[in-house]
């Protein structure tokens, strides 16, 4: 019988919903219970900002300037933590391009792979995942800022 591995999860928040958006926060939960989260200082040419997206993630641009870390620092830290691993996301169609944008701006190659969470979970498990994630996010938002 094959053992069940704990997946590594990554989530990215961005400045907006379209092609001009860029990552503003990245969070990961590793299979050994290590967690990492960082706000990202926007690069000088990253000027797109969507107020509707801000209402969703509740991160104001001035917060990024105050508490964020430089693009290169965040990308390098992700590479150190995730080298050779596969990370999973429930928002692959947006998280993967945002990570690509981060690493392109940092002038680094990603040392890890990004895969859709749907590749390892059944439809029923995905439903439970979304319900659980929504509950956790509600709790975290109560205490985050």
Regions found by a protein language model. Name each.
Residues 111-135:
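Short, flexible loop segments at boundaries between secondary-structure elements
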Residues 59-62, 128-145:
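A polyampholytic, Gly/Pro-enriched intrinsically disordered region
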Residues 87, 104-108, 126:
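Alpha-helix capping at helix-to-loop junctions
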Residues 95-114:
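Substrate-recognition/cap helix-loop segment adjacent to the acidic, metal-dependent catalytic center
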Residues 2-97, 101, 137:
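Conserved non-catalytic scaffold segment of RNase H-like nuclease domains
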